Curated annotation (Swiss-Prot):
Belongs to the transketolase family. DXPS subfamily. This is 1-deoxy-D-xylulose-5-phosphate synthase. Transmembrane segments: none annotated. It catalyses: D-glyceraldehyde 3-phosphate + pyruvate + H(+) = 1-deoxy-D-xylulose 5-phosphate + CO2. PROSITE patterns: TRANSKETOLASE_1, TRANSKETOLASE_2. Catalyzes the acyloin condensation reaction between C atoms 2 and 3 of pyruvate and glyceraldehyde 3-phosphate to yield 1-deoxy-D-xylulose-5-phosphate (DXP). GO terms for biological process: 1-deoxy-D-xylulose 5-phosphate biosynthetic process; isopentenyl diphosphate biosynthetic process, methylerythritol 4-phosphate pathway; terpenoid biosynthetic process; thiamine biosynthetic process. Pathway: Metabolic intermediate biosynthesis; 1-deoxy-D-xylulose 5-phosphate biosynthesis; 1-deoxy-D-xylulose 5-phosphate from D-glyceraldehyde 3-phosphate and pyruvate: step 1/1.
Length: 630
């Protein structure tokens, strides 16, 4: 079937099961071929082909509402709703988004990117439906990994209490990104083998009937045994106790079983949970055999071999530099522990986990818990390293404020994927953390200019004992600089001069330093002398350096790959104002007041005007001179 000719899912209504099976093969082949060129979330989508087709066949989107938790598994949904022809642009600038996008299609009723939000949103839609007295199904689709998130459990509790009509699809592939952890994962594991319960229950009931009625104690004991067995083995008791009708487990690749179960769910009043067992990566052997999450989301790859197409790496990944330095320090300091909310692979903590399994803690998709747990460990003299993506640190903001900063606890937060991350787009850009951390009392924020300085700042963080400290580091690789053998502590709040200059100054840090250096060199050739400062401590700032610089009364330009509002540049302006430098000319470059879409980082920087050319032009406008332009 030519999938690019699909306009909407209505064609599914008249298809037989054998035709649907053929469609499944076509979709898997299409996804494997298309994503080999663009990259994307291949394994999650190969696992939900039959489930997505079944949902679109039995329900009427967009009248009936599908909410895809996290959203990375929505590619099949996009194909069935008329977007197959756009897959060549997947996750590229102004191309097809890798997550549901309301402006893309009326079938995308809820936008996602972070996990565990679908049930709360579905509850809101269902309550609105009931208040408006309309009739449509609300169907959130959530994975077993996302179900470990506290927000999802809060929603389950509320939905069950209110007895709201809703069909929750639990897509259980036994993995989120990496293998799942936690007690709830173990509960689901028991449910997968719950068929054993029915045989044991029947045998127990037969035995109980043989017990003579000789006294209350025997009868009571027998009932307790029966109840205990129920809570150990009964299929779906966890969800039933929350107020849901539990259906399953059902084979998520068997159309007949899916249809039978979903039709029953449609007729059932109140909240229903359909437990669907799927195989992540189904239909592509390299993805099917992946047990650590390598094929969850990928770049381009070779279909036949399953090898990834990657440019030759000349420098280590930022995540690896940080995690390996933490590991090096952990070998001589037993107080150091590493904590991750379900991202051990992305945060490059596999080596730490292998060497110190008891000191490496993966809490699952539970950022709030991870953050406060780190705080608790700090109260007992441990040195917790919390490795968390910038975009996911947002989910634990109150815990950072209330539990870490307020108590001034020695927690080292590794803020991975800081700055623009590119193809994952609006939901994943790491551009807000400076703005929401800079104003917190006791917090120290750093970002290195290169990987060598990065390892020294990790050492600095582990030596720091005066409260919380955060290290920002970007997605991707470093610069390939020489790495010192011996680690050293860098004085807190100290900046360094990278290039001397007398006519203007650029204050910046991290990934924008090469841009600033190139701009300054071009300006030098044009006769404009510009100082470049590595403001590696975003907070506290180097106040002595700032006093000296502002006293020279030269134009200052701040550059940051982060939000302008509340950012580093704002801090410099505040310092100048509060210290009486009222004639100071300070201008800022950074991320404007909007969400930044998906695309390559280079393209996005061009689009927002954060380039070497733009820096050169800005400096020229700031200096009252007729110097020849660079």
């Amino acid at each position: 079937m030519d999938l690019t000719q699909i306009q909407n899912p209505s064609f599914l209504k008249d298809m037989s099961i054998s035709e649907l099976e053929g469609l499944s093969e076509d979709i898997r082949k299409f996804l494997i071929e298309e994503l080999s060129q663009t990259g994307g979330h291949i394994a999650p989508n190969l696992g939900v082909v039959e489930l997505t087709i079944a949902l679109h066949k039995l329900f009427d989107s967009p009248k009936d509402k599908f909410l895809w938790d996290v959203g990375h598994q929505s590619y099949v949904h996009k194909i069935l709703t008329g977007r197959a022809k756009e897959f060549g642009t997947l996750r590229q600038y102004q191309g097809l988004c890798g997550f549901p996008k309301r402006c893309e299609s009326e079938h995308d009723v809820w936008e996602t990117g972070h996990s565990s939000t679908s049930l709360s949103a579905a509850m809101g839609m269902a309550l609105a439906r009931d208040l408006k007295k309309t009739k449509e199904y609300v169907i959130p689709i959530i994975g077993d990994g996302a179900l470990t998130g506290g927000m999802a459990l809060e929603a389950l509790n509320h939905i069950g209490h209110e007895k709201t009509d809703m069909i929750v699809i639990l897509n259980d592939n036994e993995m989120s990104i990496a293998p799942n952890v936690g007690a709830l994962h173990n509960v689901l594991g028991r449910l997968r083998t719950a068929g054993k319960y029915h045989w044991v229950k029947d045998e127990l009931e037969y035995i109980l009937k043989k017990i003579p009625a000789v006294g209350g104690k025997v009868a009571a004991t027998a009932e307790k045994i029966k109840d205990s067995l129920k809570y150990l083995l009964v299929s779906g008791v966890f969800f039933e106790e929350l107020g849901f009708t539990y259906l399953g487990p059902v084979d998520g690749h068997d159309y007949e079983k899916l249809f039978e179960t979903l039709q029953y769910a449609k007729k059932t009043k109140g909240p229903v949970l359909v437990h669907v067992i799927t195989k992540k990566g189904k239909g592509y052997k390299p993805a099917e055999s992946d047990v650590i999450g390598t094929w969850h989301g990928t770049g381009p790859y070779k279909i036949e071999s399953g090898d990834f197409v990657k440019p030759k790496e000349v420098a280590p990944a930022w995540s690896a530099v940080v995690s390996e330095t933490v590991l090096k320090l952990a070998r001589t300091d037993e107080r150091i522990v590493a904590i991750t909310p379900a991202m051990p692979v992305g945060s490059k903590l596999e080596k730490f986990q292998k060497e110190f399994p008891d000191r490496m803690i993966d809490v699952g998709i539970a950022e709030q818990h991870a953050t406060t747990m780190a705080a608790g460990m700090a109260t007992q003299g441990m040195k917790p390293f919390l490795a968390i993506y910038s975009t996911f640190l947002q989910r634990a903001y109150d815990q950072v404020v209330h539990d870490i900063c307020r108590q001034n606890l020695n927690v080292f937060i590794g803020i991975d994927r800081s700055g623009l991350v590119g193809a994952d787009g609006e939901t994943h850009q790491g551009v807000f953390d400076i703005s929401f951390l800079r104003h917190l009392p006791n917090m120290v924020i750093m970002m290195p200019k290169d990987e060598n300085e990065g390892q020294h700042l990790v050492y600095t963080a582990m030596q720091y004992e005066d409260g919380p400290i955060a290290l920002r580091y970007a997605r991707g690789n470093g610069l390939g600089v020489h790495m010192d053998e011996e680690l050293k502590a860098i004085p807190i709040g100290s900046w360094e001069t990278l290039k001397e200059g007398t006519q203007a100054a650029i204050l910046t840090f991290g990934t924008t330093i090469p841009m600033a250096m190139e701009a300054a060199e071009r300006l030098e050739k044009a006769g404009v002398s510009v100082k470049v400062v590595n403001a590696r401590f975003i907070k506290p700032m180097d106040e002595a350096y700032l006093h000296d610089l502002l006293g020279k009364n030269i134009p200052i330009l701040t550059i940051e790959e982060a939000c302008l509002i509340g950012g580093f540049g704002t801090g410099v302006v505040e310092f100048a104002s509060e210290n009486g430098y009222h004639s100071a000319l300070v201008e800022r470059m950074g991320i404007p007041d909007r969400f930044i879409e998906h695309g390559s980082v280079t393209k996005l920087l061009e689009e927002i005007g954060l380039t070497t050319d733009a820096v050169v032009d800005r400096i020229h406008t700031m200096i009252p001179s007729k110097q020849k332009r660079a």
